Amino acid sequence: MGAQLLTCTVSDSIRHQFSCFATSCCVLWVPKGVSTMLPPSQLGSQPPTSDPLSCQALLPRSLPGFTHMPPLSKFLVGLALRNALEEAGCWADVWALQLQLYRFGGVEATQALIRHLQELQKGGRADWKVSVNALSSALQLLAWEQAGPKRVKRSLSNMGCENEQEQRVHNVVELLPAVGTYYNLGTALYYAIKNCTDKAKERGRDGAIDLGYDLLMTMVGMSGGPTGAVITAALKPALKAGVQRLIRYYHDEEGVTTSQPETRKDAPTYRDDVEETTMSNLVSEVESTTSNWGRPLLKNYVFLAYKR
C-alpha cells in the first residue's frame, strides 16, 4: 500500500504526532487507494490532495537542465519519477507526466514498463552489478549523439553536481518506502547523464542503478520474460533504437573501465543484429516530440498550501 505525501506546518504541541524532518514542516501519511492506470475522468473526480511543492519537487522538470536532455534520457528519468509521484499520491501530476511518456514510448509499451518497474521495485530484480562509470559514459555519449554537442554542452553546464533544493527533497523522500526508491532511480540516471558520477553512485546504492539497467534490458527484450517481448514489440522505434545504442555503448565502456558484469541466466547475449533505425529517422522523431516536454504539466489544478 502506497501513501500520500502531505507537507504541513504544525505547532510544537502537535508535532510529536507526525514524523517531522525540519522545524517548520513534517510528513503526514495518508493511505493511497487509486489504481495505477486511471483515466482522466476518474483522476478528475479525486479530491485535490496534492501539495504544490511536495509534488512539484518530484516532477522531472524540477531538475535543472532536464528540459535540455534528449528524449531517451527524459523518458527514463520521467518513468521513475512518475512512479514516485504515484506513491506520493500526486494524481494530477501522475496523469500529466504519463501522457508525456506516452508520446515518447507509446501507450502500450509505457503502461507495461510502469507495471514492470513496479514489480522490480517490489523485489523481482536481480543483481546486475552495473558499473555506474560505464553507464554514465554511455548516457553522455548517447546524449551527445542525439542532441548534438552544443545542446549537450548547455545541459551539462547548466548546474554543478550539488543542488541544495534537490538535496532537501531527497533527504525527505529517501525516508519514504517506494517513493524514495523511485526517486533515487530517477535522480541516479539524471546525475549520471550530468556526468556527476559520484552523485549517481550515491543515489544508485541499494540496487537503484541495477533496477534501471534491468529496465533498459527489458525495453529491448533481454529481460522480463514475456513482458519484455511485449514491450519491445510495442516500444516506439526511435526510443528502442536509442536503448539499443545505449546498451551497446555501456558494454563498450564497461569493457574498458571494469570487468564484465555478471549476466542473468535467463538473459540472452546481446548481438549487433538488433533492429536499427537510421540516424536521420531518429533525429526526425526526436525533434517532433521534444517540444512536448517544455509544456506545463498541469492546468486548472487546485493545490494545497505548502511551506518548506
Swiss-Prot record:
GO CC terms in record: extracellular space; high-density lipoprotein particle; low-density lipoprotein particle
Localization terms from the record: Secreted
InterPro entries: APOF
Domain of life: Eukaryota
GO terms, biological process: cholesterol efflux; cholesterol metabolic process; triglyceride metabolic process
Keyword list, A-Z: Cholesterol metabolism, Cleavage on pair of basic residues, HDL, LDL, Lipid metabolism, Lipid transport, Secreted, Signal, Steroid metabolism, Sterol metabolism, Transport
Xref: Pfam families: Apolipo_F
Keyword Lipid metabolism assigned: yes
Transmembrane residue ranges: none
Main location: secreted
The keyword Secreted belongs to this UniProt entry's keyword annotation: yes
Membership in a protein family: Belongs to the apolipoprotein F family.
PANTHER family: APOLIPOPROTEIN F
Physiological role: Minor apolipoprotein that associates with LDL. Inhibits cholesteryl ester transfer protein (CETP) activity and appears to be an important regulator of cholesterol transport. Also associates to a lesser degree with VLDL, Apo-AI and Apo-AII.
Protein name as catalogued: Apolipoprotein F
Organism annotation: Rattus norvegicus (Rat)
Protein's gene: Apof
